[in-house]
């Protein structure tokens, strides 16, 4: 059965995992790291970089480097690169393509299905946008699950026989969630969730950036925030300082030649203490405490009922965050999970549940926000309360507001405010064909259906005429089927271009290597090679050099192969002359003349004497 991968699509970093031998395993990326920066960059030549390589060149290419795109999921935000507009779904899909390719390389097979995590407090538009991103990347998203819930799965997989109430505190790069869960007998039941989708490590970085920029401005009269390259250097320095202050009480921020004015170049060289960092970010830390209180209220538990507090997300490494949670809850924090990897591992476990590889696990999640419709007077009338276990279905009967009304508009909203206008509009649809009657007489049944992904379907039915209308919520910020199809095709085109570029690099590198080894070996052999043979090889080398910097890969391959075959023939002739009794066809392989393969020339004999020691050697003239 094909593998289903689990993906933590993060604001700043992403991670991919898979079930192997009944355990979730984090898949390293092509660069050897276990997490991949959620960064996409476009180069001047049209090349697209994703992950660590994209992040590394952000300073020199700030305008075409896209970071933290997850913060714009479910909005109409677009990124303009070289007069082409990209949606957050498309940029996220590029990160997903990278994770998918790394997983395929690791598993040695195609991957087409995934479970992807989202912040628990993501609304319907944001969840649908995440699912669309997966589709664009060539992945069938079998399930969208909440990040804290995924973390609890990874935490509790080996604790199936225990009964615990846990609080998951998830502070990532761009979002924050708190979930209260009850674990017991293989059932992971979410009791309540709360959070802030605009709070995360990026905001801690921004506080530092503003402090450094304001300090520099006070000293030099220059606002670095107006310089895109300088601000990118500040971002990198702020993130580095934040990380260092998690283990040290002081760090140095040194940015030479950050800018210049009429008096010459300007530099930043300042010390930053953990105490100052805590002062700058105190309000952000305090903002994380209210959702803890609200999630406890929603669950019906007291803090004394909570058995464990699980810290998830890279930003939970900040000492002030840990201290604040300890002080607020009065409990020690569980350190048994890797905050960067646990969410992806939980997604892989959910994938294992779907395939049947993981048995006796039942996940019961909740909808994070109240769902309702607008009724007379602009009031938001609730159909499904927040923290309701999903999947769920709820119906309620409404009527018309005017005499003779033959149609009604159903305005679907999500949020906690009492007036519809103050909540998030998920969609609108019209039920027409209602039989004319005095107001209050027609009976219109509105049904909300939330699936296991937290995605909403709404239907309305006139009980008198049987007329029915329904909508799968697709907010104006979400992509249409045609837009998704177009994005899928563009993603495939990018993938093909990336593959072609990779092949081009490999072919050209191979040509360079063959030329180098051929010229080196010719020099080493000296007058062992006749003038005629030497001229023949040099002619072939010239042909390779003439074509290797071009774009005609077939011409490069042909020229390289011609050179290789010519060299085979001549080297074989040399060794036959030196050793007439040697096996025919013996000779050097220029493909194997570098590094550890030097000296391992083929001798036309497959058998190897165990007592023979490979050694580097130098060919010298006979004396």
UniProtKB/Swiss-Prot annotation:
Feature: compositional bias, Low complexity: 591-604
Organism whose genome encodes this protein: Clostridium botulinum (strain 657 / Type Ba4)
**Basic and acidic residues: bias regions:** 605-623
Ranges where the record places region Disordered:
578-623
Give the protein's function. Acts as a chaperone.
**Induction line:** By stress conditions e.g. heat shock.
Q: Which gene encodes it?
A: dnaK
**According to the lineage, what is the superkingdom?**
Bacteria
Q: Which NCBIfam families match?
A: PRK00290.1 (NF001413), prok_dnaK (TIGR02350)
Residue numbers of Phosphothreonine PTMs: 175
- Tell me which Gene3D superfamilies the record gives: 1.20.1270.10, 3.30.420.40, Actin, Chain A, domain 4, Substrate Binding Domain Of DNAk, Chain A, domain 1
CDD domains associated with the record: ASKHA_NBD_HSP70_DnaK-like
Alphabetically sorted, this entry's keywords are: ATP-binding, Chaperone, Nucleotide-binding, Phosphoprotein, Stress response
Q: Which family does it belong to?
A: Belongs to the heat shock protein 70 family.
Single Gene Ontology MF annotation = unfolded protein binding
The keyword Phosphoprotein belongs to this UniProt entry's keyword annotation:
yes
Name-wise, this protein is Chaperone protein DnaK
- State one Pfam family annotation: HSP70
Could you tell me which PANTHER family the record lists for this protein?
HEAT SHOCK PROTEIN 70KDA
């Amino acid at each position: 059965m094909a593998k289903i991968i689990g993906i933590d699509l993060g604001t700043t970093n992403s991670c991919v995992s898979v079930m192997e031998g009944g355990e979730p395993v984090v898949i390293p990326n092509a660069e050897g790291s276990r997490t991949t920066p959620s960064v996409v960059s476009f180069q001047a030549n049209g090349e697209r970089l994703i992950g660590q390589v994209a992040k590394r060149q952000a300073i020199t290419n700030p305008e075409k480097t896209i970071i933290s795109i997850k913060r714009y999921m479910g909005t109409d935000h677009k990124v303009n690169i070289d007069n082409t507009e990209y949606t957050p779904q498309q940029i996220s899909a590029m990160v997903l393509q990278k994770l998918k390719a790394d997983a395929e390389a690791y598993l040695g097979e195609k991957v087409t299905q995934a479970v992807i995590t989202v912040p628990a407090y993501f609304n319907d538009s944001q969840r649908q946008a995440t699912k669309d991103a997966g589709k664009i990347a060539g992945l069938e998203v079998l399930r969208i699950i909440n990040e804290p819930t995924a973390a609890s799965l990874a935490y509790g997989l080996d604790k199936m026989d225990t009964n615990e109430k846990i609080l998951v505190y998830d502070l990532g790069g761009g979002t924050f969630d708190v979930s209260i869960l009850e674990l017991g007998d293989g059932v992971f039941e979410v009791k309540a969730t709360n959070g802030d989708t605009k709070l995360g490590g990026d905001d801690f970085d921004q506080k530092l950036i503003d402090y450094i920029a304001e300090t520099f401005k006070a000293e030099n009269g220059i606002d670095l925030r107006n310089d895109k390259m300088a601000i990118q250097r500040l971002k990198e320095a702020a993130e580095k300082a934040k990380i260092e202050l998690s283990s040290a009480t002081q760090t140095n921020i040194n940015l030479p030649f950050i800018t210049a004015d009429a008096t010459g170049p300007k530099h930043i060289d300042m010390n930053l203490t953990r105490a100052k960092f805590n002062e700058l970010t105190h309000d952000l830390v305090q903002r994380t405490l209210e959702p803890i209180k609200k999630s406890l209220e929603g669950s019906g538990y007291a803090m004394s009922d909570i058995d464990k507090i699980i810290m998830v997300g890279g930003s939970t490494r900040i000492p002030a965050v840990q201290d604040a949670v300890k002080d607020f809850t009065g409990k020690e924090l569980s350190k048994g999970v890797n905050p960067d990897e646990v969410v992806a591992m939980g997604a892989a476990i959910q994938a294992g549940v779907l395939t049947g590889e993981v048995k006796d696990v039942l996940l019961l999640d909740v909808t994070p926000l109240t769902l309702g419709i607008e009724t007379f007077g602009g009031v938001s009338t609730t159909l499904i309360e927040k923290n309701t276990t999903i999947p769920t279905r709820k119906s309620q009967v409404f009527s018309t507001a005017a005499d003779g009304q033959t149609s009604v508009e159903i305005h679907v909203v999500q949020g906690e405010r009492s007036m519809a206008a103050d909540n998030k509009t998920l969609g609108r649809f019209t039920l027409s064909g209602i039989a004319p009657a005095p107001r209050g007489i027609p009976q219109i049944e509105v049904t909300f259906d939330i699936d296991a992904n937290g995605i909403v379907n709404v239907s309305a039915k006139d009980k008198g005429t049987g007329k029915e209308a329904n909508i799968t919520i697709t907010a104006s910020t979400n992509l249409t089927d045609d837009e998704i199809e177009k994005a899928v095709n563009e993603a495939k085109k990018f993938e093909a271009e990336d593959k072609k570029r990779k092949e081009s690099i490999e072919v050209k590198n191979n040509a360079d290597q063959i030329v180098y080894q051929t010229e080196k070996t010719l020099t080493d052999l000296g007058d062992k090679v006749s003038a005629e043979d030497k001229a023949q090889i040099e002619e072939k080398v010239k042909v390779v050099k003439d074509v290797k910097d071009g774009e005609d890969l077939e011409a490069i391959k042909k020229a390289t192969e011609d050179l290789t075959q010519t060299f085979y023939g001549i080297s074989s002739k040399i060794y036959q002359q030196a050793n007439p009794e040697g096996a025919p066809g013996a000779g050097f392989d220029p493909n194997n003349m570098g590094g550890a393969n030097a000296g391992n020339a083929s001798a036309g004999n497959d058998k190897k004497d165990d007592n023979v020691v490979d050694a580097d050697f130098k060919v010298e003239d006979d004396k």
